[in-house]
């Protein structure tokens, strides 16, 4: 493998979501956004709910987008592994399902705020963030 190429694997309990070569990866970690290049220093860190951007070596102008709902990223040599609760490529996102999830979360958030249930507010805010992330990533089709 070329020194300018790495392998990215995104794995969820449902299986492998993504397994391709990449030139550059952008991810939002719990410490902020990072850009990942081949042969970077090894690290393991948590991921936020956000989009993952992958530049592939087979087409310099093409970027793959993946909705990642948190998880852990490990960078070691030229292998980047992400283990997440759930992840979807932009082309695989069911937009109408994501829109319904957003509407449900917004309604549940109104109720939780009216009832002043702080734990429920936090839970629903995460659900809303996931739905918005999926909608954002799906817009890159």
Curated annotation (Swiss-Prot):
Coiled coil residues, start to end: none
Keyword Membrane found: yes
InterPro entries referenced in this protein's UniProt entry, alphabetically: ATP_synth_F1_dsu/esu, ATP_synth_F1_dsu/esu_N, ATP_synth_F1_esu_C, ATPsynth_dsu/esu_N
Main location: membrane
Keywords linked to the UniProt accession: ATP synthesis, Cell membrane, CF(1), Hydrogen ion transport, Ion transport, Membrane, Transport
Transmembrane regions listed in the UniProt entry: none
Subcellular location: Cell membrane
Organism domain of life: Bacteria
GO molecular function terms listed in the Swiss-Prot or TrEMBL record: ATP binding; proton-transporting ATP synthase activity, rotational mechanism
Any single GO CC term annotated in Swiss-Prot or TrEMBL for this entry: plasma membrane
Topology within the bilayer: Peripheral membrane protein
Keyword Transmembrane helix attached: no
Listed SUPFAM superfamilies: Epsilon subunit of F1F0-ATP synthase N-terminal domain
Summary of the function given for this chain in its UniProt record: Produces ATP from ADP in the presence of a proton gradient across the membrane.
The family this protein is said to belong to: Belongs to the ATPase epsilon chain family.
Subunit comment: F-type ATPases have 2 components, CF(1) - the catalytic core - and CF(0) - the membrane proton channel. CF(1) has five subunits: alpha(3), beta(3), gamma(1), delta(1), epsilon(1). CF(0) has three main subunits: a, b and c.
HAMAP family: ATP_synth_epsil_bac
Record protein name field: ATP synthase epsilon chain
Name of the encoding gene: atpC
């Amino acid at each position: 493998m070329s020194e300018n190429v790495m392998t990215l694997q995104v794995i969820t309990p449902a299986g492998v979501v993504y397994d391709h070569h990449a030139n550059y990866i952008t991810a939002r970690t719990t410490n902020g956004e990072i850009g990942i290049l081949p042969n970077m220093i090894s690290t393991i860190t948590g991921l936020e709910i956000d989009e993952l951007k992958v530049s592939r070596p087979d087409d310099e102008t093409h970027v793959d987008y993946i909705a990642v709902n948190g998880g852990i990223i490990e960078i070691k040599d030229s292998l980047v592994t992400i283990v997440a609760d759930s992840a979807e490529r932009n082309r695989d996102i069911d937009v109408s399902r994501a829109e319904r999830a957003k509407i449900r979360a917004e309604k549940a958030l109104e109720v939780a705020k009216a009832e002043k249930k702080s734990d429920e507010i936090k839970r629903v805010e995460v659900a809303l963030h996931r739905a918005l992330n999926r909608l954002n990533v799906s817009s890159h089709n």
